[in-house]
Structure formats: C-alpha cells, structure tokens
Amino acid sequence: MTKSTNSYWNPLHPESREQWQPIAGMEDLAEELTLSIDPDTGEYTRLTRFHAGADTTAFGEKSHEYPEEIFIVSGRLFDQAFDMWLESGHYASRPPGEVHGPFKTDVGCVVLEISFPNRTE
C-alpha cells in the first residue's frame, strides 16, 4: 500500500477549517490535519497549528523512536530544547531519539511534519 493521495486543495483556506482536529489534551493550544498516511507503514504527513499564545511547557519535551522532518510554514515557534525561535522557512530532519520541545508561540505557527514511524533503529 502507499500513502493516501489528494488532488490540489488548500488546507489553510478558511473553507478547510472543519477538517482540522484538536489535539487530545491540547485542545486550547493546537490542532492537526493529517494530509496523507500509509496505513501499512504508518508513515504520515500532517500539519500542526499552534494557536497564538500556546505554551506546551506542561507537557514537557518529546522524542520519538523514528525519524521525522519538520518545516515551519508560517508564524514562529520557540523550541525550548534548542533555545531557538523557529520561523517561517526553518526546516529540520530529526533523527530517532532527538529531543525537541516543549514549544511556545506568541503569534501562532503552522508546522508541516513528515514522520516515518516504521523506520525505528
């Protein structure tokens, strides 16, 4: 099986608003929209939108046993693990186990994430 496919559409357009889902436990802070997923491997591409003023400090830092790539689409996000503001255009290819977060944003932020949960080391 391969990742799901879609024709051109704009997930950031107001008409697509109803497709975004609150992230469990972070309903007032962030929401997500899965763009594509491979049901066999679990590989997925999704957008995460952090609302203006969001602060995930209470959730602590994160790491995964698999690699992921992130790209800041809009806004800015502070990654406390790196003591760095990530702004529109920033990109990272994270290896398995890399610690990131917690995050906070003053103006809001949209992050494109491509994850490979089947590629654990």
Question: What does each model-found stretch correspond to?
Answer:
Residues 43, 68, 107:
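Conserved catalytic motifs of the protein kinase core domain
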